[in-house]
């Protein structure tokens, strides 16, 4: 979710004594903890499904994805469209439950494109730094690499996944009582989206 820093800044401005506990988790864990009632609010990508009407969700934005590499790696391996090929470059990405990883690995499987190996990291800034350093490629939400694409430290590699998007949502269990601080957080998240429309 690209607006989280601005939302958190405004939350702390409006509720300076409010205590907000943040945990980094994958989308499936967020969904499961929301369903179990052990998490108050979660921001996650809705493509994980499996929550039916048990969760109340608010759409925060739909984001395109991009296959990125350093300009040098893109020059060496520009073709991720032709099927049945081995590309000797690592895929640098989050853990296996990462939704954009799953989308790209499904694409590779459908195209019978094999990569050298996978490097798993939890930090998108670290992933981007390795990719910029010619270590491998990654498939990430475009908002997370927009600055690097604009400055030329990363280059996009075309795929047939053009138009693929993921939608970020803010959710809570439908039976969960929303405290004033939780309501403020939800309002800030949804107001940020409305201000852009």
Question: What does each model-found stretch correspond to?
Answer:
Residues 1-15, 19-24, 28-32:
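N-terminal winged-helix
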Residues 3, 157-197:
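A late-sequence structural motif
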């Amino acid at each position: 979710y690209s607006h989280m820093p601005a939302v958190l800044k405004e939350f702390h401005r409006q509720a300076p004594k409010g205590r907000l506990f943040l945990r980094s988790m994958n989308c499936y864990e967020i969904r499961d903890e929301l369903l179990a009632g052990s998490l108050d609010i979660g921001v996650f990508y809705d493509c994980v499904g499996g929550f039916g009407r048990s969760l109340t969700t608010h759409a925060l934005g739909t984001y395109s994805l991009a296959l990125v590499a350093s300009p040098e790696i893109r020059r060496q391996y520009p073709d991720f469209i032709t099927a049945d090929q081995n590309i000797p470059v690592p895929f640098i990405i989050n853990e296996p439950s990462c939704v954009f990883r799953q989308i790209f690995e499904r694409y590779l499987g459908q195209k019978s494109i094999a990569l050298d190996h996978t490097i798993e990291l939890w930090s998108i800034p670290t992933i981007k730094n390795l990719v910029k350093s010619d270590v491998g490629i990654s498939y990430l939400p475009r908002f997370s690499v927009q600055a690097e694409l604009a400055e030329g430290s990363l280059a996009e590699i075309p795929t047939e996944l053009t138009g693929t998007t993921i939608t970020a949502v803010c959710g809570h269990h439908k039976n969960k009582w929303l405290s004033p601080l939780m309501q403020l957080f939800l309002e800030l998240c949804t107001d940020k989206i409305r201000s852009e429309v």
